[in-house]
Design a protein with these regions (language model features):
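Mature catalytic domains of secreted/periplasmic carbohydrate-active enzymes
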Residues: 1-153
Length: 153
């Protein structure tokens, strides 16, 4: 007889994810405008002003080149959030882009859904902007609040 499977076994969704084609990772934020790999968390949020942002174009290119899903860095180590987070002053809400009413995450999610492309988000556990970083209990509460906010909108 064949050997017994070793647990845990992937569920149908996990198996589909494992069998899917390539994923494309979008890293976009204030660093795009400062030409730096990692930000310090102190860049003026008004520097974020992607006046020609077209997330549908991103998805079109991803799909054209065979990517079945995309991942967006919703918040990198600098702490700048690409959605208007209620838990920080360091987000698109504090930028001039769309008068502080922009939301890269929502725009990309809509474009991906319309094109039938899967979407994932990366939320850095390190946050160089938030003063509570380093205070484990306070920061964990902050991080979980942002994660919940991001995943339930």
């Amino acid at each position: 007889p064949p050997p017994l499977p070793i647990l845990p076994l992937p569920n149908a969704f996990q198996l589909q994810w494992q069998k899917s084609n390539m994923a494309l990772f979008f890293h976009f934020g204030t660093n795009t405008f400062t030409d730096s790999e990692w930000g310090t968390g102190h860049a003026d949020p008004t520097i974020f002003n992607p006046t020609k942002l077209n997330t549908s174009q991103w998805i079109h290119v991803a799909k054209e080149y065979g990517f079945s899903r995309v991942l967006l860095t919703a918040k990198h180590h600098d702490g700048f959030c690409l959605w208007p987070s209620e838990y920080t002053d360091y987000s698109v809400r504090s930028s001039n882009w769309r008068n502080g009413n922009g939301d890269v995450v929502a725009d990309l999610a809509a474009a991906a859904k319309d094109a039938g492309v899967g979407l994932g988000v990366y939320l850095s556990p390190w946050d160089r902007h938030e003063e509570c970083y380093g205070d484990t209990l306070r920061y964990n509460q902050h991080y979980l609040a942002q994660m919940t906010e991001l995943l339930t909108r």
